[in-house]
A protein has these predicted regions:
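A short, structured active-site edge motif that brings together acidic residues
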Residues: 7-11, 167-176
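Short, surface-exposed connector motifs at secondary-structure boundaries
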Residues: 1, 58-60, 131-137
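Short active-site oxyanion
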Residues: 1-4, 61-62, 165-166
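Short, charged/polar "capping" segments at the starts of alpha-helices
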Residues: 10-16, 145-146, 176-177
């Protein structure tokens, strides 16, 4: 009996109880109490209605971004300057190229509606990180086509000259510092 925030398509696919579901649309600002607001920003991923979340709690802004193969100007606009950013760094391009997946799956992963490579994540972070950004958490790392070291070193290549905050890595079986 816990209320859930979801867009209509996700709620239907997960068979969520409509009485316990608060629905949102793209670019809706959802208020939770007096101090917390959450903006839903659409991101391209397959044929789903995925969104990123940009939360604001008493002036601290945090973004949670996963399952996207590319980004939009709209996403950059809303994530720019967030203090905390959690974002996927799904694969290393060379490991994916030489990995065990069939060509069709590799192309889907690489596509506009697939997932971000370490390089793409670094490029995105170079656009949105500012002196206000204190924490970056890399998520959704592929176990077959990535490694924490490759992800972090690629991100640092793109933002290391100006980013002085913390980079953490969230592995599938728990966090890694």
């Amino acid at each position: 009996n816990i209320p859930v925030l979801a867009n209509e398509r996700t709620a239907l696919e997960l068979n969520l109880d409509p009485m316990l579901t608060k629905y949102f649309g793209s670019l809706d600002l959802v208020r939770v109490g007096d101090d917390l607001s959450i903006l839903t920003v659409p991101v391209p991923h397959g044929d789903s209605d995925n969104v990123a979340f940009v939360a604001n709690y008493r002036g601290e802004r945090a973004a949670v971004i996963t399952d996207l193969g590319s980004w939009t100007d709209e996403l950059v606009k809303h994530v720019h300057g967030c203090q905390h950013i959690s974002i996927e760094a799904n694969y290393d391009e060379k490991l994916l190229d030489h990995g065990p997946y069939p060509y069709s799956l590799k192309e889907r992963i690489r596509g506009r509606g697939g997932h971000l490579s370490n390089k793409q994540t670094g490029e995105f972070l170079a656009e949105v990180c500012t002196e206000n950004t204190r924490t970056v958490v890399l998520t959704h790392l592929s176990e077959k086509n990535n490694s924490p070291h490759l992800a972090e070193s690629t991100i640092l290549y793109h933002i290391g000259d100006f980013f002085s905050g913390d980079i953490d890595i969230s592995l599938q079986d728990g966090p890694e510092k």
